């Protein structure tokens, strides 16, 4: 059994209902596709036989838009005997059928699955608060960031009568993403997408995925980060404006799988925290900017 020192991110959908500029997994664009738990359950069962994980975050996209989210929570919790955090933008609590029961029913021992909300606009907190209170079971305790019992260091911690927890974190700025959209002159409705052309060493040095060791399970395959997993899939849907040589490089990354684990896992983990050739497609410190998020709901014109 191989012990991973850090949590893993389990990515289950490209789909998001918001258009947050500079989303680092490109979900602000028309990025489609989601993963059904039953399609990957057997592979994750095999993973549970070879690795041990300290914690898991289920994310997207917007994971609440994956109709099998309760199955993911139940399945990952039971297979890996681990705490599961669900990372959401907080706009879909009233459409989360079956999720509360999944959070409640899979608990055993020290496992306490919970929800984390990345709140992109602090002026939306009161609306979010109403939705969270609707989702949880009264009475609900609300702790601020300075409360001694807020062990998650969140801006607000909601804990209900069944000890189900929703943490809210204000996240209203994003850094420059790998994919750069632009509109061709004379073709205002046709978007084209570019990647960066950086020194891989310097891109990796300032990469949030690398700094916070955000390793990703996508389609039951383990990747160094989200972009290296998702850029080829985005390219399939939108055809990035890159050279054939760069496209070959983009698709050359070898993830760790249950099938190649025995032959490849030592090399994979030994190099996991080192730059890879595909880092060239991400920004460096010189090209990174920080932008305040003003998310729109997709298909609507008003700010969230």
Language-model region placement:
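Conserved alpha-helical substructure of the radical SAM core
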Residues: 1-101
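Short catalytic/ligand-binding loop motif for oxyanion handling, primarily in non-cytosolic enzymes
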Residues: 30-31, 65-67, 94-95, 123-127, ...
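Short, surface-exposed linear patches
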Residues: 33-34, 44-45, 79-81, 95, ...
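Polar/charged alpha-helical tracts
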Residues: 38-45, 49, 78, 101-105, ...
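Generic structural signal of hydrophobic/aromatic residues within well-ordered alpha-helices
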Residues: 62, 128, 132, 250, ...
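Conserved AdoMet/S-adenosylmethionine-binding subsite of the radical SAM
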Residues: 66-213
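Accessory C-terminal segments flanking Radical SAM cores
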Residues: 183-304
């Amino acid at each position: 059994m191989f012990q991973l020192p850090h949590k893993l991110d389990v990515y289950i959908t490209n789909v998001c209902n918001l258009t947050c500029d500079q989303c680092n997994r490109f979900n602000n664009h028309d990025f489609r596709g989601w993963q059904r738990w039953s399609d990957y359950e057997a592979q994750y069962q095999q993973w549970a036989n070879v690795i041990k994980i300290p914690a898991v975050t289920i994310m997207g996209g917007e994971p609440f838009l994956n109709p099998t989210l309760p199955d993911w929570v139940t399945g990952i919790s039971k297979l890996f005997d681990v705490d599961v955090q669900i990372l959401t933008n907080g706009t879909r609590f009233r459409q989360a059928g079956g999720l509360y029961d999944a959070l409640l029913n899979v608990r055993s021992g020290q496992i306490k699955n919970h929800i984390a909300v990345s709140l992109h606009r602090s002026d939306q907190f009161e609306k979010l608060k109403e939705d969270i209170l609707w989702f949880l079971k009264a009475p609900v305790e609300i702790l601020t960031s300075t409360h001694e019992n807020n062990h998650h260091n969140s801006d607000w911690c909601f804990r209900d009568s069944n000890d189900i927890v929703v943490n809210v974190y204000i996240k209203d700025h994003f850094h420059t993403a790998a994919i750069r959209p632009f509109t061709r002159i004379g073709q205002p409705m046709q978007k084209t997408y570019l990647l960066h052309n950086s020194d891989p060493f310097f891109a990796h040095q300032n990469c949030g995925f690398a700094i916070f060791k955000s390793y990703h399970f996508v389609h039951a395959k383990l990747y160094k980060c989200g972009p290296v997993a998702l850029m080829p899939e985005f390219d399939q849907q939108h055809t990035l404006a890159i050279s054939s040589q760069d496209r070959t490089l983009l698709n050359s990354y070898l993830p760790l799988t249950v099938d190649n684990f025995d032959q490849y896992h030592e090399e994979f983990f030994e190099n996991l925290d080192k730059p890879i050739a595909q880092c060239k497609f991400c920004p460096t410190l010189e090209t990174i900017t920080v932008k305040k998020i003003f998310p729109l709901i997709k298909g609507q014109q008003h700010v969230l």
